[in-house]
Amino acid sequence: LDFSAGAGLATHGAAALAAVPEGGLLLSHTDLHWNPARYLRACEGARPDVTHLSLQLLPYPWFARQHPLHPRMKRWPDVAAASTDPATERYERLVEDVATGNLDAFPAGIYLDLHGVHEPHIGRLGSWRGRWNLVPWGLHYRIVAAGAVQGDAGEWLARSLAEIDRLKAAYEGGPPSPDRFRVGSWEIAAGAAYNDAHSCVGCNPTRGALS
């Protein structure tokens, strides 16, 4: 990918990977989140330490043939009734099954596409499905066990803010804007994701740390 000043997708993919600590698990939902990072890993050799999965592809029966390519996965979810719609119970159960079966296998953390969750389902301090907290983490949410954030909300907020600083540094000249790219393009979508990442830090997942 071209990393020139106009290469918004390259920057987006690099920023997504940079937010994942060594050995982490990255779960993509949107094409925008999946393809730039996948290209960098597959074609440019970036971040071979990261396990990267698409929640759009995971439910397909044929994907079972790909399991050996991801040896660090401890347990694969039951995808018989899975959905790819984040607003549905079946999709949330898919994500939860991945987290439940693999949180111990990835001590560096599990990171979910920022747009891979239905925002109205996220409660105070990022509580989600009663068992988890979703912590804003740049272009992702970090999935952590329930109670972890409540115990030290200020520390988790500091981590969220540090990831925003990292994201801002990646987009040194600012995110793609309609002045340079066509509305509806992937570059503009990348700019929207950049702005959403900033907004999420001030929303429910960290609001309790500020009160």
What are these regions (language model features)?
Residues 3, 14-25, 29-38, 44-211:
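C-terminal luminal/periplasmic domains and tails of membrane-associated envelope-modifying transferases
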